[in-house]
Amino acid sequence: MSMKLHVKTWGCQMNEYDSSKMADLLNSTNGYISVEHAEDADVVLLNTCSIREKAQEKVFHQLGRWKKLKVNKPNLVIGVGGCVASQEGKAIRSRAPFVDIVFGPQTLHRLPEMIKEVQENKGTVVDVSFPEIEKFDSLPEPKADGATAFVSIMEGCSKYCSFCVVPYTRGEEVSRPLDDVLLEVAQLAEQGVREVTLLGQNVNSYLGATYDGDTCSFAELLRFVASIDGIDRLRYVTSNPIDFSDEIIAVYEDTPELVNFLHLPVQAGSDRILAAMKRGHTVAQYKDQIARLLQVRPELTVSSDFIIGFPNETDHDFEQTMDLIKYINFDTSYSFIYSQRPGTPAADMPDDVTLETKKQRLAILQDRIQQQSQGIGRKMVGSVQRILVEGPSRKNIMELCGRTENNRIVNFEGDHRSIGGFVDVEITEVHTNSIRGKFIRGEAEMNLRESIRPSDIVNKHENKSAVNSYIPA
């Protein structure tokens, strides 16, 4: 009888990607079947995030619920992974001794061996090391789940912003080899994936090794991925303005597969606060980057991250942030109240902005972003948008839903055979959280590239070590 696995995920798209790899790995090596409820599982894994406040306490609350399951099922294996595990491994072992496995983001590929050790009664297993890119060499072929997919291109970050724990929990920047990334994308395209999102803590700094000993920049990678037939839409997260080069901007000019949507975190609109955050750029530099992008992509919409109430943030600093929001006309944002992260330089700064002030500023900022988002949405009425159809609408299963290039959800009446493909839809109504449209045409009437097998995009060459490498044709 097959063993059952339950994975609970908190945090960013990278964590979602890692969790999917855990499930694929354990299925391919040991036949584990994923289940929705922890009560039904033989192994439960918690993939954690340490970015937000009280992340550690949130973990222990969840583990407390799982402890009760273990009372009734003594052989249940409980594992904690992700950034909290990497940062607080000792605390987890101390406060939750019933946890069997503690593993970091870079050691998830060792899960089959860790679980085996626990099941053989060899005690608790802890591995939160940083074995660079080793985990990608040990993972199975990707499995597509719909028309969209995430592909990790690098791990870690070397920027050391004063508020951020990522360099301490995921390590410094390590890029996957170019061939590995292209092969994974081609394998996903073979399975019907049409849209790929490239993932990394700072994708702009990607420098992947090539088969001939050279390196590939992020701009070059974007063009390579866009050239794979079947991949008609390309996204990426997350970016850092200091690595957003002219070469990347040039890709927006000549690569239509790259969507008209960019998430480029700025965090604050005050140069003084940006310096305290150690962001490495100014407001003027950020504005200049967006202006040059809009010159080559006038229809581009932009989203960002904002930290509210960073130490010593004054009313004037916040007003400057609001000025930047208006100037750029951000479509959406991920905005949060500042909270100290243990081990970061900012944790040594006095947290001198009151919670009430932080909440007031956050409400003002989010209200402004919402107004701008609604304004951008209203301008879409009457336009024809290309939609990647994701499936039936949640509100009406007789209708379809999909996303525009600028990440808006659109509901419309159409043929369910369109699921997984593209349609053109005229936008008729705009609501706060969704858009309604009218079907105009399907893929048969579009001028998309002729579909060929994505595996033909790469040529397989065997080197002297009998190791396959994959080189763009």
Curated annotation (Swiss-Prot):
It catalyses: N(6)-dimethylallyladenosine(37) in tRNA + (sulfur carrier)-SH + AH2 + 2 S-adenosyl-L-methionine = 2-methylsulfanyl-N(6)-dimethylallyladenosine(37) in tRNA + (sulfur carrier)-H + 5'-deoxyadenosine + L-methionine + A + S-adenosyl-L-homocysteine + 2 H(+). PROSITE patterns: MTTASE_N, MTTASE_RADICAL, RADICAL_SAM, TRAM. Residues 3-120 form the MTTase N-terminal domain. It holds the Pfam family TRAM. Residues 143-375 form the Radical SAM core domain. Its EC number is 2.8.4.3. [4Fe-4S] cluster 2 binds at residues 157, 161, 164. InterPro entries: Elp3/MiaA/NifB-like_rSAM, Methylthiotransferase, Methylthiotransferase_CS, Methylthiotransferase_N, Methylthiotransferase_N_sf, MiaB_methiolase, rSAM, rSAM_horseshoe. SMART domains: Elp3. The keyword Cytoplasm applies. It comes from the Bacteria. [4Fe-4S] cluster 1 binds at residues 12, 49, 83. Binds 2 [4Fe-4S] clusters. One cluster is coordinated with 3 cysteines and an exchangeable S-adenosyl-L-methionine. It is found in: Cytoplasm. Its cofactor is [4Fe-4S] cluster. Its main location: cytoplasm. Keywords: 4Fe-4S, Cytoplasm, Iron, Iron-sulfur, Metal-binding, S-adenosyl-L-methionine, Transferase, tRNA processing. GO terms for molecular function: 4 iron, 4 sulfur cluster binding; metal ion binding; N6-isopentenyladenosine methylthiotransferase activity. GO terms for cellular component: cytosol. Monomer. Belongs to the methylthiotransferase family. MiaB subfamily. Catalyzes the methylthiolation of N6-(dimethylallyl)adenosine (i(6)A), leading to the formation of 2-methylthio-N6-(dimethylallyl)adenosine (ms(2)i(6)A) at position 37 in tRNAs that read codons beginning with uridine. PANTHER family: CDK5 REGULATORY SUBUNIT-ASSOCIATED PROTEIN 1 (PTHR43020), MITOCHONDRIAL TRNA METHYLTHIOTRANSFERASE CDK5RAP1 (PTHR43020:SF2). This is tRNA-2-methylthio-N(6)-dimethylallyladenosine synthase. It comes from Psychromonas ingrahamii (strain DSM 17664 / CCUG 51855 / 37).
